[in-house]
Regions:
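Active-site nucleotide/adenylate-binding loops and adjacent lid/helix of ATP-dependent enzymes
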Residues: 1, 13, 17-24, 86-92, ...
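ATP-binding N-terminal substructure of ATP-dependent carboxylate-amine bond-forming enzymes
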Residues: 1-101, 110, 131-134
Length: 175
């Protein structure tokens, strides 16, 4: 004879109205949100009746189990975060950072033109499309040395260099 009594504690019934996947990478050196902020997001979700699950890049196939996606990793177009955002949007989920925002915000040329068009003060800016001597002379005349060079799709200080001389400028543009 078997005992009909349940030998384990039954799971608490879920009363969450929504389930949100929060994409994180615990190995990231400079994440957009630290561990304390992630805990606060989870607590705030609980107070609103939203279950927040931290997921990693290995959860791509399970993304459809959720109502929304909140990306708390550094995003880039050639990164799994962009693929997650696209899939979530295609599945009709609420997505923060959505693919369109990732596309726009990772493009410094787009952002610089947008700010200038809307009257937002920005440092003197020039876009470089070649590394020939004529271009180098134009940059020095227009912006003066020293200057800061940035790649158009870098983030968190990656792809940034300060140049003080014409030689450093030429070497950085040719690198």
């Amino acid at each position: 004879q078997f005992n009909a009594r349940v030998w384990r504690n039954p799971r608490r019934r879920r009363s969450d109205r929504y389930e949100l996947a929060m994409l994180v990478n615990e190995e990231e050196v400079l994440p957009p949100s630290d561990k304390a902020a992630l805990k606060r997001f989870i607590r705030a979700g609980r107070q609103l009746g939203i279950r927040v699950d931290q997921i990693g890049r290995d959860a791509y196939t399970r993304l459809g189990e959720y109502d929304g996606l909140f990306i708390r990793e550094t995003t880039a177009l050639d990164h799994h975060t962009y693929q997650f955002a696209r899939k979530a949007e295609q599945e009709g989920m609420v997505v923060m950072d959505d693919p369109g925002s990732i596309l726009r915000c990772t493009n410094k040329i787009y952002l610089a033109e947008l700010m200038q068009a809307n009257g937002v003060p920005v440092p003197p800016t020039a876009f470089v499309f070649s590394d020939d001597d004529e271009q180098i002379d134009r940059l020095i005349e227009e912006l003066k040395l020293p200057m800061v060079l940035k790649i158009p799709d870098g983030s968190f200080s990656r792809g940034i260099s300060k140049v003080k001389t014409r030689e450093e400028l030429a070497a950085s543009l040719r690198a």
